[in-house]
Amino acid sequence: MRKGIHPDYQEVVFMDSATGAKFVAGSTLKPEETIEFEGKTYPLVRVEISSDSHPFYTGKQKFAQADGRIEKFNKKYGMSSKN
């Protein structure tokens, strides 16, 4: 690898703004803010959503009921499924 062309890779703390959950991961981001986490000082990156608050990972995901929507459409526009 050529020297001087790659960004500095460092460990940073990502904090979920919605839940306050924190986790350490490697990143090339250079945030100004720092935080004390598990006895060490890390740069802090605040994120709006993470696996701790995303509905897909928390199991609170809503699924659209396609059958009900189709029936509602047919009822609204006078179409019947019995042709």
From Swiss-Prot:
InterPro entries: Ribosomal_bL28/bL31-like_sf, Ribosomal_bL31, Ribosomal_bL31_B, Ribosomal_bL31_sf. The keyword Ribosomal protein applies. GO terms for cellular component: ribonucleoprotein complex; ribosome. One of its GO terms (molecular function) is structural constituent of ribosome. Pfam families: Ribosomal_L31. The keyword Calcium does not apply. Keywords: Ribonucleoprotein, Ribosomal protein. One of its GO terms (biological process) is translation. Disulfide bonds: none annotated. Coiled coil: none annotated. It comes from the Bacteria. Part of the 50S ribosomal subunit. Belongs to the bacterial ribosomal protein bL31 family. Type B subfamily. This is Large ribosomal subunit protein bL31B. It comes from Lactobacillus johnsonii (strain CNCM I-12250 / La1 / NCC 533). The gene is rpmE2.
